[in-house]
């Protein structure tokens, strides 16, 4: 996580991960523009609960509308991608201003959610479910 001067503008970057999704979030001061894979944020993430979940770090730190966000996200589905976006935004906000650490840490936004899909085992119907057992 490096701070760099990109065309004389302070740019901060954070990488977020969730399930099999990876999001790279670039934050710089602006008017609140949010682009995900060169598309508008609302058209990329259409479910309202996923949208609010992804933007919750900005709401908690009272920075919604103060920064422009450019996000590249790939892998997984829309739920994993929005979780990765939330993780990336949190890391970038922490890099931008370290006073955000306590707020983000207490809500668990800086912690990587390590839950993944458990693999199916042979001799069983699913990961944990067994085939139906018949005594006779």
Swiss-Prot record:
Keywords: Ribonucleoprotein, Ribosomal protein. One of its GO terms (molecular function) is RNA binding. GO terms for biological process: translation. One of its GO terms (cellular component) is cytosolic small ribosomal subunit. It holds the Pfam family Ribosomal_S9. The keyword Ribosomal protein applies. Belongs to the universal ribosomal protein uS9 family. This is Small ribosomal subunit protein uS9. It comes from Borreliella afzelii (strain PKo).
